[in-house]
Amino acid sequence: GLPVCGETCFGGTCNTPGCICDPWPVCTRN
């Protein structure tokens, strides 16, 4: 399946592909 977003992203970037840091500071599916 697709990787799950949800890691914190205080630096503004997400390590998980297809995820964006919005709403900050939590990564969500782009």
From Swiss-Prot:
Q: Where is this cross-link: Cyclopeptide (Gly-Asn)?
A: 1-30
UniProt's post-translational modification comment states: This is a cyclic peptide.
Say if the entry is tagged with keyword Coiled coil. no
Task: Show the InterPro entries listed in the entry.
Answer: Cyclotide, Cyclotide_moebius_CS, Cyclotide_sf
Q: Which cysteines are joined by disulfide bonds?
A: 5-19, 9-21, 14-27
Q: Where on the tree of life does the source sit, at the highest rank?
A: Eukaryota
Q: Which UniProt keywords apply?
A: Disulfide bond, Knottin, Plant defense
Entry's Gene Ontology BP terms: defense response
Q: Name one Pfam family in it.
A: Cyclotide
PROSITE patterns, alphabetized? CYCLOTIDE, CYCLOTIDE_MOEBIUS
Record's SUPFAM superfamilies?
Answer: Cyclotides
Q: What is known of its domains?
A: The presence of a 'disulfide through disulfide knot' structurally defines this protein as a knottin.
Which family is annotated? Belongs to the cyclotide family. Moebius subfamily.
| Function per UniProt | Probably participates in a plant defense mechanism.
* Protein name per the record: Cycloviolacin-H3
Species assigned in the record: Viola hederacea (Australian violet)
